[in-house]
Amino acid sequence: TLLAELVGDLLPPGVLNIVQGFGREAGEALATSKRIAKIAFTGSTPVGSHIMRCAAENIIPSTVELGGKSPNIYFEDIMQAEPAFIEKAAEGLVLGFFNQGEVCTCPSRALVQESIYEPFMAEVMKKVKQIKRGNPLDTDTMVGAQASQQQFDKILSYLEIGQQEGAQVL
């Protein structure tokens, strides 16, 4: 991969290992290999549980960061801050969703105190409207397509669940 080409010669052999493939083939092979000294995994709880079982069977130390993404919470005192701070708070919320959920610390939702909902979300939506969607090969594109139809369908199902539970999709 490009990353390996860029930094491969800067690191001692074995420090950077890029393994491509799906979890069942690539991940499970790593989690059961006697050549692996330690496993660090970030991802879903079911997959993390499976990796920990595989690692335990082979007595491989492991560290996991699993699911349970937390909300970003905004209280009314934020609106008493300088405009630049409010803008950065709105930008932070947008950037949290910008990575498409691929970071364990990204928020899964925002909780905004009702008294500031309208003005704060107006600021957030200004930021959202600046996002250029399109072909991921276009250097001006900020958000491209989902990795697969399966991932796209999963996202739509979460939106549907949220709406059924009373969430508003903006």
For the regions a protein language model found, what residue spans apply to each?
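Periplasmic-binding protein-like
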Residues: 38-42
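ALDH superfamily catalytic-core signature
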Residues: 11, 44-170
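Beta-loop-alpha module in the N-terminal Rossmann-like domain of NAD(P)-dependent dehydrogenases
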Residues: 22-29, 43-50
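Short beta-strand(s) of the beta-wing in winged-helix/HTH DNA-binding folds
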Residues: 17, 37, 168-170
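PLP-dependent aminotransferase-like
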Residues: 1-27, 84
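Well-formed, non-transmembrane alpha-helical positions, independent of function
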Residues: 29-30, 161
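Acidic-histidine catalytic/liganding microenvironments
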Residues: 33
